[in-house]
Amino acid sequence: MGLVFLGPPGSGKGTISKIISNEFKYHHISTGDLFRENILNSTTLGKEIKKIVEKGELVPDQITIKIVKDKIKAIKKNDNFILDGFPRNICQAEALDKFLPNVKIINFLINEELVIKRLSGRRICKSCNNIFNIYTLATKKNGICDVCKGDLYQREDDKEECLKTRLKEYKLQTKPLIEFYSKCSRLNNVDASVEIDEIKKKIIKIMLKKN
């Protein structure tokens, strides 16, 4: 089974993806993780992606589609998977339908103010990559990781002005996509402002529902 998680940055897609992946043995394919992996490894695409995200812009379709397709090809044929953050527009959706038809589409709904608060407070450990939040998951010592004592940092694209740019572009690009899936009755909306356990229950219900 394939699941597609749609929603703005900070809507909880990544957190829920990891929970579902661990409990139900799904592969979690996150475009954000794939981008960061390429940036970290300084691949040709990674260098290009880094310049784009630091400006608060969305990565072009041709790059995103290639990275996602390559990842899916590396997965066993009958394994379950979650696509987190892909597709993001009609072009990507059409590409997805060509090589992965009949996936279930789940859209995470959340207001912009809550997204900005969640992401502007996010801090990441430079050493072990654990994620904390100064508002919801603060460390015992300011700026220091609770796990490995490494230094924490804030991603450039998590700063408020950059977030506003990202959210504006997200809305412009994904509105037609949401309408596209709504018209063909494939869209399952989930309130992402509630507690994680509540979101999880709703996702499982959708997973069990027949197409």
Curated annotation (Swiss-Prot):
Matches recorded under InterPro entries: Adenyl_kin_sub, Adenylat/UMP-CMP_kin, Adenylat_kinase_CS, Adenylate_kinase_lid-dom, ADK_active_lid_dom_sf, P-loop_NTPase
A Gene Ontology molecular function term of the record: ATP binding
Any one of the GO BP annotations: AMP salvage
Catalytic activity: AMP + ATP = 2 ADP
Positions of ATP binding: G10, S11, G12, K13, G14, T15, R122, I131, F132, V194
Binding site for AMP: T31, R36, E57, L58, V59, G85, F86, P87, R88, Q92, R155, R166
Record keywords: ATP-binding, Cytoplasm, Kinase, Metal-binding, Nucleotide biosynthesis, Nucleotide-binding, Transferase, Zinc
Pathway recorded for this protein: Purine metabolism; AMP biosynthesis via salvage pathway; AMP from ADP: step 1/1
Cellular component terms per the entry's GO annotation: cytoplasm
Protein family according to the UniProt entry: Belongs to the adenylate kinase family.
Quaternary structure (record): Monomer.
PANTHER family: NUCLEOTIDE KINASE
Domain notes: Consists of three domains, a large central CORE domain and two small peripheral domains, NMPbind and LID, which undergo movements during catalysis. The LID domain closes over the site of phosphoryl transfer upon ATP binding. Assembling and dissambling the active center during each catalytic cycle provides an effective means to prevent ATP hydrolysis. Some bacteria have evolved a zinc-coordinating structure that stabilizes the LID domain.
Task performed by this protein: Catalyzes the reversible transfer of the terminal phosphate group between ATP and AMP. Plays an important role in cellular energy homeostasis and in adenine nucleotide metabolism.
Protein name according to UniProt: Adenylate kinase
Organism: Borrelia garinii subsp. bavariensis (strain ATCC BAA-2496 / DSM 23469 / PBi) (Borreliella bavariensis)
